[in-house]
């Protein structure tokens, strides 16, 4: 993005330490303002160690973290600024906010989430679907997540159903269906191009640099944008 410079790219698949490419993060000791990770949640520990040692802001763009990894992220955020989001689309950030508001306005409605991704995606349900569900649950403290439906029986009002489809090369589609006895509200977001996630991450990185230690999300970003 304009006004930004990638000073190092880290991947074990790159040629060893050539042309700004490095095979390991620890091998790079040059200047940087922020670290952005789009790799895999298993790299979380090493990323946190590196950023803590150098007091660098860290932007995490992976999903599927274990409970231990989440605890590590929270502990690191007491020392450095950490931006942690399951999805860096600004549209998804708005959808998350709308989902919470709609759930609060229709407290007795049935709510189901449907997410669709490419057939190579490994985690089920998507991290974004869980973020949406948690946003809804923030105004429904007794909510119960149902991942798919594998048993016979009536649906209870407390349930939030989450359903996953894996098809072709879809970048990502998320739908929230909110149904009362007399109407249905459907909120939908569709990613047309994966570049939007990189654009959103760069915007989040600019937001993060200069912030005090803390754990930041896309909601912090959009609320700051709205306040300006």
Located regions from the model:
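Short glycine-/small-residue-rich Rossmann-like dinucleotide-binding loops
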Residues: 39-40, 63, 164-166
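Rossmann-fold NAD(P)-binding glycine/threonine-rich loop
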Residues: 42-54, 61-84, 90-93, 97-102
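Short, acidic/small-residue loops that bind anionic groups at enzyme active sites
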Residues: 60-62, 84-86, 111-113, 117
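Short acidic/histidine-rich motifs immediately flanking catalytic phosphotransfer sites
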Residues: 28-36, 53-58
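Short, surface-exposed loop/turn motifs that are enriched in glycine and acidic residues
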Residues: 84-92, 118-125
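C-terminal substrate-binding/catalytic lobe of Rossmann-fold NAD(P)-dependent oxidoreductases
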Residues: 1-28, 32, 107-228
